[in-house]
Each structure stands twice: as structure tokens, then as C-alpha cells.
UniProtKB/Swiss-Prot annotation:
One example of a Gene Ontology biological process annotation: amino acid biosynthetic process
Pfam families, A to Z: SKI
Cofactor binding summary note: Binds 1 Mg(2+) ion per subunit.
Species annotation: Synechococcus sp. (strain JA-2-3B'a(2-13))
Full protein name: Shikimate kinase
UniProt entry keywords in alphabetical sequence: Amino-acid biosynthesis, Aromatic amino acid biosynthesis, ATP-binding, Cytoplasm, Kinase, Magnesium, Metal-binding, Nucleotide-binding, Transferase
This enzyme's EC code(s): 2.7.1.71
Chief place of localization: cytoplasm
Cofactor(s) essential for the protein: Mg(2+)
Recorded metabolic or biological pathway in which this protein acts: Metabolic intermediate biosynthesis; chorismate biosynthesis; chorismate from D-erythrose 4-phosphate and phosphoenolpyruvate: step 5/7
Gene (UniProt): aroK
One annotated Gene Ontology cellular component of this protein: cytosol
Keyword Magnesium: yes
Subunit comment: Monomer.
UniProt-annotated location(s): Cytoplasm
Length: 187
């Protein structure tokens, strides 16, 4: 249970959810925002709005670098506000410039077991441009390995090793945030 007086300890900063595609950032982000009484934004959805097409189309027509530029632009705009929960794209951690925005808030890494992410993503791999390879599972595991050191820079790590309902995951995230708040918000 999230109490309003505890939320005040966040001092109006944003909560950035980071982690691999399929980790549940968008699903749990809206519920976390509702409980915190913050607004929720999903950078992928905003990139689609700014880019005027789906992420898959943006990748196909303009390439990954263009997509990452749009992602940075969206993140820069969101970081000028406070009291937001922001579900970020899985690769947002790759650009040092993005960390300059992420560090203005509290970053929470949803560290989901690789097998669990694969189980989720294989239901609909066509929506994931970076998995359009002959061996999408190997591509996923390679991406996870490459990105883990970046994700590990998060202020809070929430290990997820089995399917968890969104309300349970929100509680798990909140407990991890509370523990981090006891140590002080990073600056």
C-alpha cells in the first residue's frame, strides 16, 4: 500500500522505468502512476506520435539511429516535468545523453529473467524490430547481455523471476523505492 505522505518523499521527481522490451514497464507503469497520483507516459507511444508511424515502421523507413534521436527528444521534453512515471524504451539507456535526463529522477530497473522475457515476446515477435532475425531468442539474449551494465546504473533494481500480477509488481517496486528513499534520493 502506498501512502501519500511516503510519496511526498519523492520530492516531485519523476520515476523512470527501465529494462528490456517485454519487462512490463508499460503495463506496470500506468498502475504505479495511478497509485502515486503521478501522470503516466510511455516513451514508445510518444515516439510513435512524434514520428507519425509505428516503431516498426520508423525502424524500417529511417533506421535505429533516427528512432533513438526521437526517443532522446521525447525524454528531454518529459524530463522538464515532475511527478511522472515514465516507461522508457529498452534501449534508452544506451545513449549517455539520455542518462543526463534519467539522473534527474529515480530510475527503476525491472530486471526480468531472460526466459520470462522470451516467453512474453515470442507471442508477438513481429512488433519488435530488433528481434527480426533468423534466431530472435539468441538476438534477445545478446541484447540483454549488452544492456545489462547500463541497466545496472539504475537507482533501484527490482528482480523479477516469475510471472507476477501488476498489483503485486507495483507493491514490489514501491518497496524497493521506499528502501532507496531511506538512503536518500540520488542527485
Amino acid at each position: 500500500m502506498i501512502h501519500p505522505e511516503e510519496v511526498e518523499r519523492l520530492r516531485g521527481v519523476n520515476v523512470y522505468l527501465i529494462g528490456m522490451m517485454g519487462s512490463g514497464k508499460s503495463t506496470v507503469g500506468s498502475e504505479l502512476a495511478a497509485q502515486l497520483r503521478f501522470q503516466f507516459f510511455d516513451t514508445d507511444g510518444l515516439v510513435e506520435q512524434v514520428g507519425g508511424s509505428s516503431i516498426a515502421q520508423i525502424f524500417a523507413e529511417h533506421g535505429e539511429a533516427y528512432f533513438r534521436d526521437l526517443e532522446t527528444q521525447v525524454l528531454a521534453q518529459l524530463s522538464s516535468y515532475t511527478r511522472l512515471v515514465i516507461a522508457t524504451g529498452g534501449g534508452i539507456v544506451l545513449r549517455p545523453k539520455n542518462w543526463s535526463y534519467l539522473h534527474h529522477g529515480l530510475t527503476v530497473w525491472l530486471d526480468v529473467a531472460p526466459e520470462l522475457i522470451w516467453q512474453r515476446l515470442k507471442r508477438d515477435p513481429g512488433q519488435r524490430p530488433l528481434l527480426q532475425t533468423p534466431d530472435p531468442q539468441a538476438a534477445l539474449y545478446k541484447l540483454m547481455q549488452e544492456r545489462e551494465p547500463f541497466y545496472a546504473q539504475a537507482d533501484v533494481r527490482v528482480p523479477i523471476r516469475s510471472e507476477t500480477s501488476p498489483p503485486q509488481l507495483v507493491e514490489q517496486i514501491w518497496q524497493a523505492i521506499r528502501a532507496r528513499l531511506r538512503d536518500g534520493i540520488p542527485s
